[in-house]
């Protein structure tokens, strides 16, 4: 469970639980079998990638971070009751930075999102300004071992990502790991404006993840250059997430 506000100086004032979700609920879905891998990044090296009205979110150590996050998405609905046809269950892998806006909302800024569902790509690119890419993807699990594999089809055909992990024991997240995983929305750019797309979910149940193989081209292709050692990897069986009504940031 996440630490309460005030238990760590590094998290003082940080929203470790989601604020009230603006209604109506736009999407409802499950994220499962998810792995978090993170590297530190100098904030000034990525500041130019952020849309107007946002900037790199910086932890108490003076660094921002880039994440490689593969998982499986399922049970996507419009609102809370209407399943979206032709979507079903499919793997995704996202590369994300961490953002904050002038209203103090801490979110993520996606640099890319790999998906095996072609129909998702134009809908999210046009409708939400989220940079989805169409990829050939596989996710294989055998007991405590999971392999995530993707090969980009469009755009920038051929980009690859391969990750194999072994799931370990339950862990108590550090303040930095809370800061990285307790994110209640995404900043996007659409139609010349910056948007906040809010979400809510319960705290991530987190386990250690031992990396057996990591061969990734997506981080480099995103234009982000890590500046230090990789953090410990984390695995989660998943959460149920809801997205609320987007609002304009600037």
What do these predicted regions represent?
Residues 1-2:
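Short, small-residue-biased leader/transition segments that mark boundaries at the very start
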Residues 19-30:
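A short, surface-exposed helix-loop junction/capping segment
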Residues 32-38:
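Short amphipathic
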Residues 94-250:
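Internal, well-folded beta-alpha domain core
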Residues 10-11:
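N-terminal, charged low-complexity regulatory/assembly segments
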Residues 27, 43-93:
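Glycine/small-residue-rich interface belts in oligomeric ring/scaffold proteins
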């Amino acid at each position: 469970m996440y630490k309460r506000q005030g238990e760590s100086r590094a998290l003082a004032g940080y929203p470790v639980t989601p604020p009230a979700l603006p209604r109506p609920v736009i999407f409802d879905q499950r994220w499962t079998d998810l792995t978090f891998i993170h590297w530190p990044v100098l904030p000034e090296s990525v500041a130019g990638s952020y849309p107007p009205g946002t900037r790199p979110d910086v932890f108490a150590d003076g660094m921002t971070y880039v994440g490689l996050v593969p998982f499986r998405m399922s049970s996507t609905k419009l609102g809370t009751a209407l399943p979206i046809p032709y979507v079903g269950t499919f793997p995704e892998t996202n590369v994300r930075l961490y953002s904050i806006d002038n209203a103090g909302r801490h979110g993520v800024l996606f640099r890319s999102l790999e998906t095996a569902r072609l129909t998702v790509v134009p809908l999210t690119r046009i409708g939400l300004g989220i940079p989805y890419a169409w990829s050939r993807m596989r996710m294989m699990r055998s007991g405590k071992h999971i392999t995530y594999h993707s090969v980009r089809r469009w755009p920038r055909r051929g980009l690859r990502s391969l990750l194999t992990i072994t799931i370990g024991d339950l862990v108590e997240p550090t303040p930095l790991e809370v800061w990285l995983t307790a994110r209640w929305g995404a900043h996007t750019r659409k139609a010349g404006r910056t948007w906040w797309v809010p979400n809510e979910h319960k705290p991530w149940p987190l386990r250690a993840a031992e990396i057996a193989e990591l061969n990734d081209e997506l981080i480099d292709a995103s234009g982000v250059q890590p500046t230090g050692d990789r953090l410990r990897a984390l695995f989660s069986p998943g959460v149920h997430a809801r997205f609320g009504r987007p609002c304009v940031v600037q």
